[in-house]
Amino acid sequence: MQAYQRDFIRFAIDRGVLRFGEFTLKSGRTSPYFFNAGLFNSGSALAQLGRFYAAAIVESGIPFDVLFGPAYKGIPLAAATAVALAEHHQRDLPWCFNRKEAKAHGEGGSLVGAPLTGDVLIIDDVITAGTAIREVMQIIESQDGAKAAGVLIALNRQERGNGELSAIQEVERDFGIPVVSIVSLTQVLQFLADDPALKQHLPAVEAYRAQYGI
């Protein structure tokens, strides 16, 4: 586990974004942990989050020309990541996002920010069913000269969907692009094992992974 990954897990726990207990997911599964990126909801938290995304981009080595933040949750994530890349990695890259509803006046269209062209790195919080990413792929494919380079998310739950694959594996298979994450469940388990105060949650998370993991 990289230092930034350990720091991210601690940061997510401290902010209440990553919690342990008993939670019912939209899928109906009862999960021993819950991740809610919407709780990175202050200026300092967003700045720090952007630095973690930027670190994961550098670590991934994925080449790209523009960052794309899917509406709505991906918008502040892409903005914060673009700032962090410029300030901490001397990589001043363009970014853009989509509107849910196209505007008939002003700029017009459904895209805002830099032109969506070249290799596009999509920034989002998690991939649950893959539906949102499939919508984003349609947007990218509709732009001349644009193609998806990959997807970066905060947490990979490493969890099967209805079939044998996870939603992330299905996206990778269907679109031929890498999906990378700041951390995955593997690192969360490692963090729990190393933390005396949180180790009590390890058996439940391990059991959940044994049942639903990939």
UniProtKB/Swiss-Prot annotation:
Source organism: Pseudomonas fluorescens (strain ATCC BAA-477 / NRRL B-23932 / Pf-5)
Cofactors (names): Mg(2+)
Residues the entry annotates as binding 5-phospho-alpha-D-ribose 1-diphosphate: 26, 72-73, 99-100, 103, 105, 124-132
One Pfam assignment: Pribosyltran
GO molecular function: magnesium ion binding; orotate phosphoribosyltransferase activity
Catalyzed reaction equations: orotidine 5'-phosphate + diphosphate = orotate + 5-phospho-alpha-D-ribose 1-diphosphate
SUPFAM superfamilies: PRTase-like (SSF53271)
Subunit structure: Homodimer.
The name this protein goes by in its record: Orotate phosphoribosyltransferase
Residues at which orotate binds: 34-35, 128, 157
NCBIfam families per UniProt: pyrE
Magnesium listed as a keyword: yes
PROSITE patterns (UniProt xref): PUR_PYR_PR_TRANSFER (PS00103)
GO cellular component entries: cytoplasm
